[in-house]
From Swiss-Prot:
Biological source species: Geobacillus kaustophilus (strain HTA426)
Record pathway: Amino-acid biosynthesis; L-methionine biosynthesis via salvage pathway; L-methionine from S-methyl-5-thio-alpha-D-ribose 1-phosphate: step 4/6
Family membership noted in the UniProt record: Belongs to the HAD-like hydrolase superfamily. MtnX family.
An individual GO BP term: L-methionine salvage from methylthioadenosine
Superkingdom of source: Bacteria
Classification of source organism: Bacteria, Bacillati, Bacillota, Bacilli, Bacillales
InterPro entries for this protein: HAD-like_SerB (IPR050582), HAD-like_sf (IPR036412), HAD-SF_hydro_IB_MtnX (IPR017718), HAD_hydro_PyrdxlP_Pase-like (IPR006384), HAD_sf (IPR023214)
Stated name of the protein: 2-hydroxy-3-keto-5-methylthiopentenyl-1-phosphate phosphatase
HAMAP family registered for this protein in UniProt: Salvage_MtnX
Record keywords: Amino-acid biosynthesis, Hydrolase, Methionine biosynthesis
Catalytic activity reported: 2-hydroxy-5-methylsulfanyl-3-oxopent-1-enyl phosphate + H2O = 1,2-dihydroxy-5-(methylsulfanyl)pent-1-en-3-one + phosphate
Gene label: mtnX
Keyword Amino-acid biosynthesis attributed: yes
Length: 220
């Protein structure tokens, strides 16, 4: 049976060259955010708890300023536009699964990815400070407090005839990478794929991803 490629692609540090949450915090947050970041990386607190607390340090009134800042400074990784066009031409389902927040993920992907194919955390600006919401929290099979739970989304969106490929770079992509049939990896995720013996290939740009997918189409 021929299998259908299905792609799950991270946003921060994968589609974009930098991590947008870190960029926001460096630009707008008081120094307390650093300790929260360290606690997340050391797994002393969950991603959900840490990200929620970091954004609660920011006044809701900064929303427009933050979006303007990211529009000016965010760079999409080379080849991403061509990669999106490639998936559309070949009819390959592409889902963006992001630990980022809706108020900046949607504007940065506008005109490239249909909103219904983007899965990320939500936001509420009705209070004094920014409150993050979690429309894609962990299902019953995950207790990691992921925030936007990528393993849960893969379980939900997987196809019986699917060959599921995860594209990512960081610790937030590791759990879903373990569930995938194949991983396109860079940075931290690449090291972990090598250590754990996960089926993978490295990438630097999305042109590399296109090349790998073209080879996969022949195999699957």
């Amino acid at each position: 049976m021929t299998k259908q490629l299905v792609l799950f692609c991270d946003f921060d540090g994968t589609i974009t060259e930098n991590d947008n949450i870190i960029a926001i915090m460096k630009q707008f947050a008081p120094p307390e955010w650093e300790a929260l970041k360290d606690d997340i990386l050391a797994e002393r607190i969950s991603v959900q708890e840490g990200v929620g607390k970091m954004f609660s340090l920011l006044p809701s009134s900064l929303k427009g300023e933050i979006i303007d800042f990211l529009r000016r400074t965010t760079r999409l990784r080379a080849g991403f536009r061509e990669f999106v066009a490639f998936t559309k031409e070949r009819g390959i389902p592409l889902y963006i699964v992001s630990g980022g927040i809706d108020f900046f993920v949607y504007p940065l992907l506008e005109g490239l990815i249909e909103p219904e194919r983007i899965f990320c955390n939500g936001s509420d600006f009705s209070g004094e400070t920014i409150r993050i919401t979690w429309p894609h929290a962990c299902d019953g099979e995950c207790q990691n407090g992921c925030g936007c739970c990528k393993p849960s989304l893969l379980r939900k969106l997987a196809r019986p005839d699917g060959y599921h490929v995860v594209i990512g770079d960081s610790i937030t992509d590791l759990a879903v990478a373990k569930q995938a049939d194949y991983v396109m990896a860079r940075d931290f995720l690449l090291q972990k794929c090598q250590e754990l013996g996960l089926p993978h290939a490295p990438f630097a740009t999305f042109f590399d991803v296109i090349d790998a997918l073209q080879r996969m189409e022949v195999i699957v």
